[in-house]
């Protein structure tokens, strides 16, 4: 009995389940999904229309979740890695202390955030490969984490 307990204690981390991946979409040249990179796993829905194509996409990002903190002074820490290269962390300010450009700036804890954000990266050329982007949403003077998501994009072809 003791060897079994010792074995299961020492090697339990090896046999744990990987974090669940949330599929977003597939396009002709890419697949996109995310998983949580924090332990809070607060339900967040992410949808992209149309699905991302690496040749250049202009579309809308739909984000739906219930705020677990007041959304004030919101910024995103972006950690991006491309193949084996990691880019310097980028900090994007989304909401300032007294408002911002987005309707969810100033939302209170428990309120539903249901927003659509336009995006475009036409003219940018991506090489085939796997891209990772960790998005940490930080809010308030105490810099509390709202959520952390780890996005993965796999670019299949070299059609760009």
Curated annotation (Swiss-Prot):
**Gene Ontology terms, cellular component aspect?**
extracellular region; lipopolysaccharide receptor complex; plasma membrane
PTM annotation? N-glycosylated.
Q: List the disulfide bonds.
A: 25-51, 37-148, 95-105
Name the principal localization, coarsely classed: secreted
Keyword Glycosyltransferase found? no
The protein's superkingdom reads Eukaryota
Q: Which residues are glycosylated?
A: 26, 114, 150
- According to the record, the signal peptide region is 1-16
Question: Where do the segments described as Interaction with lipopolysaccharide lie?
Answer: 119-123
- GO terms for biological process, alphabetical: cellular response to lipopolysaccharide; detection of lipopolysaccharide; inflammatory response; innate immune response; lipopolysaccharide-mediated signaling pathway; positive regulation of lipopolysaccharide-mediated signaling pathway; positive regulation of tumor necrosis factor production; toll-like receptor 4 signaling pathway
Matching entries from InterPro entries are given as: Ig_E-set (IPR014756), LY96 (IPR039217), ML_dom (IPR003172)
Localisation per UniProt entry? Secreted, Extracellular space; Secreted
Among Pfam families, the record links this protein to: E1_DerP2_DerF2 (PF02221)
Q: Which UniProt keywords apply?
A: Disulfide bond, Glycoprotein, Immunity, Inflammatory response, Innate immunity, Secreted, Signal
The job of this chain, per UniProt, is described as: Binds bacterial lipopolysaccharide (LPS). Cooperates with TLR4 in the innate immune response to bacterial lipopolysaccharide (LPS), and with TLR2 in the response to cell wall components from Gram-positive and Gram-negative bacteria. Enhances TLR4-dependent activation of NF-kappa-B. Cells expressing both LY96 and TLR4, but not TLR4 alone, respond to LPS.
User: Which PANTHER family does this chain map to?
Assistant: LYMPHOCYTE ANTIGEN 96, MD-1, MD-2 - RELATED
**Quaternary structure and interacting proteins, as annotated:** Heterogeneous homomer formed from homodimers; disulfide-linked. Belongs to the lipopolysaccharide (LPS) receptor, a multi-protein complex containing at least CD14, LY96 and TLR4. Binds to the extracellular domains of TLR2 and TLR4. Ligand binding induces interaction with TLR4 and oligomerization of the complex.
Q: What is this protein called?
A: Lymphocyte antigen 96
Lineage, please? Eukaryota, Metazoa, Chordata, Craniata, Vertebrata
């Amino acid at each position: 009995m003791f060897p079994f307990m010792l074995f299961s204690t020492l090697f339990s981390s090896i046999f744990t389940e990987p974090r669940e991946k949330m599929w977003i979409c597939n396009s002709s040249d890419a697949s996109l999904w995310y998983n949580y990179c924090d332990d809070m796993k607060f339900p967040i829905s992410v949808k992209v229309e149309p699905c991302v194509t690496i040749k250049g996409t202009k579309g809308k990002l739909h984000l739906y979740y219930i705020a677990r903190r007041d959304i004030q002074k919101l910024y995103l820490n972006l950690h991006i890695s491309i193949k084996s290269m990691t880019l310097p962390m980028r900090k994007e300010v989304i909401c300032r202390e007294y408002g911002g450009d987005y309707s969810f700036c100033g939302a209170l804890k428990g309120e539903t955030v249901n927003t659509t954000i336009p995006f475009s990266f036409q003219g940018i050329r991506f090489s085939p490969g796997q891209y990772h982007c960790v998005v940490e949403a930080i809010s308030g003077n105490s810099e509390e984490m709202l959520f952390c998501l780890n996005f993965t994009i796999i670019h299949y072809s070299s059609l760009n």
